[in-house]
UniProtKB/Swiss-Prot annotation:
It comes from the Bacteria. SUPFAM superfamilies: Zn-binding ribosomal proteins (SSF57829). GO terms for cellular component: large ribosomal subunit. The lineage of its organism: Bacteria, Bacillati, Bacillota, Clostridia, Eubacteriales. HAMAP family: Ribosomal_bL32. One of its GO terms (biological process) is translation. It comes from Syntrophomonas wolfei subsp. wolfei (strain DSM 2245B / Goettingen). Residues 1-21 are annotated as: Disordered. Keywords: Ribonucleoprotein, Ribosomal protein. This is Large ribosomal subunit protein bL32. Belongs to the bacterial ribosomal protein bL32 family. Coiled coil: none annotated. One of its GO terms (molecular function) is structural constituent of ribosome. Residues 7-19 have a biased composition (Basic residues).
Length: 56
């Protein structure tokens, strides 16, 4: 089994650990009712429709 040959600096350690937190921005889709941008699989905040049904 491999053993570290040199001590890793704080900067390199922190840089490696920070990568897992990066999350892509969610894609936006156009609402079929009012044509505003909204998050997918959620009701439109502008008109209140979700899957062609008024929910809000």
């Amino acid at each position: 089994m491999g053993v570290p040959q040199r001590r890793q600096s704080h900067a390199r350690k922190n840089k490696r650990r920070s990568e897992w937190r990066k999350i892509d921005k969610p894609g936006l889709v156009e609402c079929p009712q009012c044509h505003e941008l909204k998050m997918p699989h959620r009701a439109c905040l502008n008109c209140g429709y979700y899957k062609s049904n008024k929910v809000m």
